[in-house]
Amino acid sequence: MRKFIIAAVLLAVLPTGNVQACVSEGPTHNKYMFSVFRRDAMDGPAYLADINQYWIDYCKGRIAADDYDRTGYTFYNNHRSEVLKVAQAKGDQAMAAYLKLLNRYIDVCDLFTVDRWSYPTKEQLATRKQKALAILNAAKAYRGTQLRQQYTLLQMRANMILGYDLANANLWNQQGKRFGKSCWREAMQNIYARTLYKSGKRLEACDQYALTNDMNSIKRVMGNYRNLAGIKSVYAQNPNSPALNYLVQDFVNNVQETLDQKPKNSDDCEWLNEIDAKCIFRNEALAFVEFAKTVAKQGKSATPCLWWTAAGMTDYLLGNQQQAMEETEQALNAAGTQRMSDNARAIRLLVTTRSARLDDAYTTYLLGEMRWLDGMIKAERSTMAYDNHYTDVKDRMVHKGLEPLFSKAGKPYMALALCDMMRQEESAYYAMAYKREEQKGYSKYQYMRHSPWDEVFCQMDSMKTDQLVGYYRFVTSTPNNALERYTVARAFKDDQYFNDLIGTKYMAEGAFAKAIPYLEKLSTEFMSNQPISIYEAQTNYDVVRWFKRQPIHYNSNEYYSPDNEYHEVTTNKKLEFCKEMMRLQSQYALTRQGQPLEELSYQLAVRYFQASCYGDCWWITHHYKSVSDSARSWELDYAKQAIEHLNLCKHSQDEQMRYRTLYALAFVHAYIPGNSWMSITYDKDWNEVMNYRPESAQYKALAELNDYATNHPERIDEYARRCDVLQRFQAMNHQP
């Protein structure tokens, strides 16, 4: 029993999950739904990716580009000396000369970055200006045609750091805008937009930023207009300003964010400010709806679809279902860009999930929209760096709309299958993105997690076992309904996974005979590639836990190393446990009172406690553990079963059996919530204060053990004498 109070706390350091995380740390499925431009437009202008790709292509076969080079648009900066060598190796003298000048420009820019937090001296400023002027003059001196656009862009960049904004405006109007479409021309146009903004022409600057797909700069320029008053002001100046696309999208998504965070007033908006969102309270949101509908009807805007959809999504968020249905219906038939029409269609789909009836017509409509979303996801998906909008649309529509809809309609299996379908689509994408199938030695079973961080597993784990059997039967069937067939075809249905889960859950219920047919089908490969395998391989259920703790030896000193999750399992201990428990229970039922019955009862207690959520072999009945574990209402309380069997033995005529049982009871009660013999608090000076609980089960068990040790000291072994908890109990003045 040594340190068994602390032992319960130490279980927290095991690399296993906490079921509470399924709620507090799980996904919200609440990504922004309103999107009238691609999300990567907020990462910067589109030409950055094109310029990056230009250099990758130029060095193809000579410099390998990794994912960071591609997604971070940093290929040239990461390899600029190598790119120069490539140009020289190609004999491209014109490019080599340009690269040397470009590198000089980058070096000057780096000087400004170094001094971001300090003031340079006059001499340093003068030196930088001289270097920038030299770059400007060298760029102007170029007389070739091959790299004319690059050199013109370099002139504008040099002008920018010199503060020559008027010169840039003239250069754009006289030369830049006459160039053919290219990434270099777009970069010049972006600098020209900056010039307009600095001269006070805010909306004209936004027009230019929009042409280069640079919504992030529009956000920066329109920072003080991110509210209804700002939207009205811009609309009054230009009903078709590209800035309105950003401002309207930002407003609607901020309404959603405000409702999610639930601030009571502006003083509660700290987190929204931290994530660069704006508080939009109900009155302003309602006023926006009326303004948006007015704009859509006026005829001044070329994109009424934008405004009808914005009104519909806002009303949906505010709970005005009928208005949202009417407004999104208007949006579907209104003029707008293709992206706006797609946005209206996606939001209309979400709105219908709140009030639709699950008849054949609606499920047929849903299936068509699901397939449409699949096509949109495929078309928009590119790299891991791009957060696909339509993936989020489908995710929110399924989790926030369809799951509750099917659950309320009495179809919980379909609701769970929809949830799992989304998990499988996400898992397949990440597996593809990381090319896991190419990793040698990576078992397919390592994708199958019984993890408390997985919301599908959490739902299945909270089911009664017969319900889970029904769910598995559903996803492996061929339903008559086309939407159900679409869903179950995409749901996870590996027989090893479900045999393990169902068999383990039957064990948790104490239904050993029902568990055996499922557990018999498990392979050692599957068991070895589960996160619990490291515990399964190193602990045994017949070890007496109150006299011996079985430590886990990890494969790596790195706590979160994957090597600490997996261990080769050579036998099916869960199956062996089931068979042994059935054998012991059968013998117990046939044995009369006396020593044989007591020995059987003690052996059952040992196994019940080891297989409980408090034992070393918790993996027998669960796939994870935490310090807050306890038996669930539908499970067999293994610890309670252990106590009942120990109570039968504590009055044994066999003194050794009596001692072992009294010690075991004092130990086991330490793990049961509410049974602890004392608690610790602190006084005003932070001195430890012991609060004894004579009414608790552990206190009474310790008192019995203490009385036995006092009256029969010769029968107490050294292990019990060294027990710090018993020593503490004996030392205290425990009279209430």
What are these regions (language model features)?
Residues F4-V13:
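Sec-dependent N-terminal signal peptides
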Residues V13-V19:
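C-terminal segment of classical bacterial N-terminal signal peptides
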Residues Q20-R157, L162-P736:
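Extracytoplasmic/secretory-pathway proteins
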